[in-house]
Amino acid sequence: VNSDLFLHPDASTIALLPWRPEHGSVVRMFCSITHPDGTPFAHDTRGILKQAVADAAKAGYAFSFGSELEFYLFRLDENGEVTDVPYDQATYMDVAPEDRCENVRREICLTLEQMGIQPESSHHEEGPGQNEVDFRYSDPLSAADNAVTFLTVVKTIAARNGLYADFSPRPL
């Protein structure tokens, strides 16, 4: 039913993937989705958000979002399979040496900055292996795009460090 759709790149969202320079430049960008006749695809989440923001503006409302995104870091076993063993046993706002995730979070934040995304802060959360990265307030579409990019960056940086990133609310 929806096999023929068109992607319309939003050039303002282009960003180099900093972890891919050894394979030539690779970028990510977001797109709008339409049917071949140009009508918007009803399940295009960016399109849905744009329409919601436009509807709110017509009603006199404007929004800014400042996300606090959390994730857990888990160890892998000798075969590279995910375990249920957290990377550390630190608690809220701990620092090294208890917070073994500190350098991974730093690498995540620096990678995001290279991509033009400005994290406001990062810290260890309450649970073992639980981390949080906070973002500055921005418009809804940028906040959503940044959240999607964040998921990819966290998974990639975790894997590069021999870890697994889990975004479940309570994986332990």
Per-range role (PLM):
Residues 1-172:
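Glycine-rich, acidic/polar active-site loops that bind/position phosphate-bearing ligands
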